Amino acid sequence: MDMRVPAQLLGLLLLWLPGARCDIQLTQSPSFLSASVGDRVTITCRASQGISSYLAWYQQKPGKAPKLLIYAASTLQSGVPSRFSGSGSGTEFTLTISSLQPEDFATYYCQQLNSYP
């Protein structure tokens, strides 16, 4: 039985920075995907300017608060399954789910931590 698990993803996230600096835009791709249980899934987040490793990934399920998965681009938050991993620095980052599980149905967000409004 082919069990399809859709995962809606945030397409564009704009974060405003203080002072004279330009806004940093984060663009996630793909904007939507459909995958099977057991698949390897990769989500990309691109920043409009370098943010070193100051990036976090969140998972949000309907009716629930966002859950921190990864911070500092690649550090797994305590309690998060090891099938989740993050990589990248500068302007390009990836979130990988090595073997998709039914409970991974969610919306996934990247957030830059380089500066705050």
Curated annotation (Swiss-Prot):
Residues 72-78 are annotated as: Complementarity-determining-2. It is found in: Secreted; Cell membrane. Residues 57-71 are annotated as: Framework-2. Residues 24-117 form the Ig-like domain. PROSITE patterns: IG_LIKE. Residues 23-45 are annotated as: Framework-1. Disulfide bonds join 45-110. Residues 111-117 are annotated as: Complementarity-determining-3. Residues 1-22 form the signal peptide. CDD domains: IgV_L_kappa. It comes from the Eukaryota. InterPro entries: Ig-like_dom (IPR007110), Ig-like_dom_sf (IPR036179), Ig-like_fold (IPR013783), Ig_sub (IPR003599), Ig_V-set (IPR013106), IgV_Light_Chain (IPR050150). GO terms for cellular component: extracellular region; immunoglobulin complex; plasma membrane. Residues 79-110 are annotated as: Framework-3. Residues 46-56 are annotated as: Complementarity-determining-1. Transmembrane segments: none annotated. One of its GO terms (biological process) is immune response. Keywords: Adaptive immunity, Cell membrane, Disulfide bond, Immunity, Immunoglobulin, Immunoglobulin domain, Membrane, Secreted, Signal. Immunoglobulins are composed of two identical heavy chains and two identical light chains; disulfide-linked. V region of the variable domain of immunoglobulin light chains that participates in the antigen recognition. Immunoglobulins, also known as antibodies, are membrane-bound or secreted glycoproteins produced by B lymphocytes. In the recognition phase of humoral immunity, the membrane-bound immunoglobulins serve as receptors which, upon binding of a specific antigen, trigger the clonal expansion and differentiation of B lymphocytes into immunoglobulins-secreting plasma cells. This is Immunoglobulin kappa variable 1-9. The gene is IGKV1-9.
